[in-house]
Amino acid sequence: IGNAAEYVEIRTFHSYCFDLLGKVGSIDDSENVVDKAVDAVMDSQVERSRITKSILVIDEAQDMSEDEFALVRELVRNNDDMRVIAVGDDDQNIYEFRGSDSRYMGLLISEFNAKVYNMLENFRSCQPVIALANSFARTIGNRLKSEPIRCVVGGDGCVRLVRHPAGYYGQAVVDEILAAHRSGSSAVLTMTNDDALMVSAMLGRRGVKARLIQSNDSFSLHDLAELHLFYSDIRANCSTIIPDNVWAHAMELTTGEFAGSSSLEIALSCIGAFEKEYPSKRYVSDLFNFFGESELSDFCKAARNEIVVSTVHKSKGREFDNVYLLLRGMTQITDRERRVIYVGMTRAKTNLSVHFDGGIFHSIPELADGGGSAAGLSIENDPKLYAEPDELLLQLSHRDLHLDCFKGKSDIISKLCSGDALNVIDDRLYTTVNGYSQQVGRFSEAFRTKLSKLQQKGYVPISSRVRFLLFWH
C-alpha cells in the first residue's frame, strides 16, 4: 500500500492499552492493563487523538476476551464512522484458559449488525484431512460457522486413526515415525507439555533429531540473556532511531558473547524477524515492544531433518506435511478440548495420524462403528499395552527452583550459557569452575515433591542442562 503504511498501527491489545495509559509494557502489569485502559477511555482520561480511528481490523477475533471486547465497544462508541473488520474462526478458539471466548466475536456480529463473509476455501490440507476435520467440527457445540470448509489443493494424502488401550502409547507414535520414512516436514503434536517432553525423549533415544517447541510463559523475551545484551548495547549507543553501525555492533557483540549458547539461534531468529518487519528505519521503542510482545515459540525453527515436537497450543499458525497427533488420556472431552483437537488436525497438509484412547470419535456417525468409508482414511485398533518410558525429560521453570538460592551467585551464573551441563546432587544443581564444584541452583519444594514421586517409580536424575539464562529484576 506504499506510503499509506506509515499511517497503519499494528499492535496487540496489550501494547495498545499500555500506550493509551502512557506506560511501558511489562508482564507484571499486563494482566489488568486492558481493563484499566477501558476505564480510562470511558472516563475521558485518554487523549482523543489516541482513540480516533477510521478503520479497526481485529485479527484472530475468536480469541477476544471480555475486556478486549469492551475496548472494541468503546472504540466504536467514540468513532461514529469507523469501519470494523474482524477476522476469525470460532472453531480455533483454544485460549479459553487466558479468558478468550468466541462468543464475543458473535456479539460483534449481533450488536453491530455486521455482515458475515464465510471464507471456506482451505489451501493447506488434502481432502482426507479436510473430510475428517469437517466431520469432527460438527461435534463442537455452539458454533458460528455452519458450512464445511472446502479443499482447494490437489494431491494425495491419508488419514490414519489408531485406537489404543489407555497407557503410555507415545512409543507407538515413535515407532510409526521410524517405519514411515515420510518426506517433508513432520511434527508430533500433543495435548500436554508432559507428553511432548516424553515423546521428545523417546525420539532422542532412538536417534531421531527432535526440536521441542518451547514457551516463555513465565518470562519476557527482554530478559533472555542473549536479547538482553543485544538491546542493552543498542540502548547504550542510541535513544531513538537505530543507526546501521550500532545495530551491527550489537549483533557482533551478542554472537561473540553467546557463541556457545543453545539459545543463540532463537535469539537471532527473533532479531531477524524484527529486521524483516522494519527493513529500513528501526526505532529503539519498536525493538523494545517487539521483544515484549513476541512469543518464544514463534522463533523455534526446525531443520529439514528434525521432527518438531510441540503441544497443539504452541503449533497454532504452523503447518506440516506430516502430523502425528497424540491424544493420550482424552477420554472425557468438552468443546474446549474438541477445538484443540480440531486445530491439531488442521496443521496437517498431506498425512495425519491420530493416536487416541477412549471414544473421541464415537459421535461421528461414519466413524462410530470402527470403519472408515472415506477415501484416504483408515481406522485401526492397537491392543498392545506399552510400558512406561525408560527415560523422561523434564523442563524446569521459575516455579521449580528456589529463587533465593540465586542471590550472591551472579558471578558464577554469568559464566554459564544455555545448553551448559549441570550436575544434579540431591536437590541441588552444580557447575564446575576451575576444577571446583559450585552450587548454582536448588529445587523448589513443589519440584522436590514431583521428583520424589518419580523416584518412587524407579527414575533417577542422571543429567541436567541450562535451559535459559535470564535476568531477574
Which sequence ranges carry the predicted segments?
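Conserved helicase/translocase motor-coupling segment
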Residues: 171-301, 306
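Extended, charge-rich low-complexity interaction segments
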Residues: 37-52, 148-158, 236-266, 382-393
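Short basic/glycine-enriched coil/helix segment immediately N-terminal to the Walker B
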Residues: 30-56, 77-80, 319
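Conserved helicase motor core of SF1/SF2 NTP-dependent helicases
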Residues: 55, 62-155, 164-167, 187-205, ...
